[in-house]
Every structure is written in structure tokens, then in C-alpha cells.
Regions:
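Asp-based, Mg2+/Mn2+-dependent phosphohydrolase catalytic module
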Residues: 2-9, 15-18, 111, 115-118, ...
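N-terminal helical cap/lid subdomain that shapes the substrate entry/recognition surface
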Residues: 17-24, 28-111, 115-120
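Conserved phosphate-coupling serine/threonine residues in phosphotransfer and NTP-handling enzymes
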Residues: 27, 128-130, 212
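Residue-level signature of catalytic and energy-coupling elements of molecular machines
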Residues: 39, 68, 128, 163, ...
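Residue-level detector of anion-binding/catalytic polar loops
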Residues: 49, 123, 207
Length: 239
């Protein structure tokens, strides 16, 4: 048995791992510093400022919609209306792309794990609070376009993580694409770096591996296991 042959019931039984669902920011790419810079670039002209530590503590894990709402309300402003929110998100997306084009590091070990999965035909998907625009831009730069199916983004769900919808949709998409595998939530491993993401995955019935790429291990207590990054992690170690 591998590291994650753990059922979600009260007792432990072996489960066959059939698919991996990756979060994106902090799991595939070390993008949170870039997101912070983009948010700050848009917020500061409005008189809103916050530290990177506050960003990691209060805003990571939300999609851009809810992040802006929290930034405004926590800093004493009324939440933006829909029209203002749409402009903020568009401006932040452009700022983020400009920053990403200067270079983006991947999380240690993730490219090797993705390459192995693609070589073996092992199903992989993405469930992220980022926008499809952000994700596609980075995947294109990494030459990973087309490697994940499905890709569930903030554009497809009404609520941010910890709501379980994004992971539920990812499993549903995997099951529809690969009916012969009879993929169920408990057959899938989510790889996450935030408490909200772990809660989302567990709420949808997935197993969860936590990475301490953006925070401390004590924030990821719902995960079956917590490790620093994906260096040396292979499909064999996960099965």
C-alpha cells in the first residue's frame, strides 16, 4: 500500500488511487507572491494596503472575487458592487499576467510528477480558485497546456473554497471522461496548500495531501498527510 491508501470512513481500508486533482497556486506554481503584488498594485491606488503576511493569513484560498470583497471589508470599506468588482478582477488579471511574464517558479517536484502521470496515462485534473485566464497563461508558459482534464476554475463555481463544489466538479468531470474507471471521490487525491483547499477537498469526499508551500503544517490538519513540497513524490509513493 502507498502513502494514501486511507479510506474516509472511521476505519482504514486500502483504496486504489485513480486520479489526482491539483490545486494550482502554491501546488503547481509558486504564484502567491505574484498574486499579492497584483492585488496590491490594484488596491493601493484606492488607499488599501496590506502586508504579504496578512495576504497569506487572510486572503489566500479565496478566488479573486471573494479576496477583493474581504480586502475591502477588512480594511473598512464597503464591499465593491458587481460592476466595480468586475473591473477590479480584470485589472488584477492584467497586472498578474505582466508579473508572471517576468518569470514564475514551479513547486519543487511537481513537473516530474505531472510528467510521470502524462507518460503513464494517469488521470490528472485541476481544481483552483484562480481564473481560467490566469491558469491558461501560466500553463502555456510552462508548456503544460492540454495536460489536465478537467480544469475547474473560479469562473465555473459560485463560491470560493472551502465550498466543495470545485472538487466535486473535478471528480464529476474525470468520471464522465473515463467511465470505465468508475472514478469516485474517495478514489481521488487532492493536493493542496491551504486550509480552505483541504476543507474543500475533504468536503467533496477526496483524500488530501497538504503542502507547506504557503503556510505552516498546523493549518492543514484535515489532510491525511502534510509534506513540504512534491520533491521525490512519485505515483508509486502515492498509490
Amino acid at each position: 500500500m502507498g502513502l494514501f491508501c486511507i479510506s474516509l470512513q472511521a476505519h482504514y481500508t486500502a483504496r486504489m488511487l485513480k486520479a489526482i486533482v491539483f490545486d494550482f497556486d502554491g501546488v503547481i506554481v509558486d504564484s502567491e507572491p505574484a498574486h499579492y503584488r497584483a492585488f496590491l498594485q490594484i488596491a493601493q491606488p484606492l488607499g488599501l494596503t496590506f502586508s504579504y503576511e496578512q495576504y497569506l493569513k487572510d486572503y489566500v484560498g479565496f478566488d479573486d472575487r471573494d479576496a477583493f470583497r474581504h480586502i475591502f471589508t477588512q480594511l473598512g470599506r464597503p464591499a465593491p458592487d458587481d460592476a466595480q468588482l468586475a473591473r477590479l478582477i480584470e485589472d488584477k488579471a492584467q497586472a498578474f499576467e505582466d508579473i508572471v511574464d517576468q518569470g514564475m517558479d514551479t513547486i519543487p517536484g511537481v513537473l516530474d510528477l505531472i510528467a510521470q502521470a502524462k507518460a503513464e496515462g494517469f488521470p490528472i485534473a485541476i481544481a483552483s480558485g484562480a481564473t481560467r485566464r490566469d491558469i491558461d497563461h501560466i500553463l502555456k508558459g510552462l508548456k503544460l497546456s492540454g495536460g489536465f482534464d478537467p480544469i475547474i476554475t473560479a469562473d465555473l463555481v459560485e463560491y470560493s473554497k472551502p465550498d466543495p463544489t470545485s472538487y466535486a466538479l473535478a471528480v464529476k468531470g474525470l468520471a464522465a471522461r473515463l467511465p470505465a474507471l468508475n472514478i469516485q471521490p474517495g478514489d481521488c487525491l487532492a493536493i493542496e496548500d491551504t486550509a480552505a483547499g483541504i476543507a474543500s477537498a475533504r468536503g467533496a469526499g477526496l483524500m488530501a495531501l497538504g503542502l507547506t508551500t504557503t503556510g505552516s503544517a498546523d493549518k492543514l490538519g484535515q489532510a491525511q498527510r502534510v509534506i513540504p513540497n512534491l520533491q521525490g513524490v512519485t505515483l508509486e509513493k502515492l498509490r
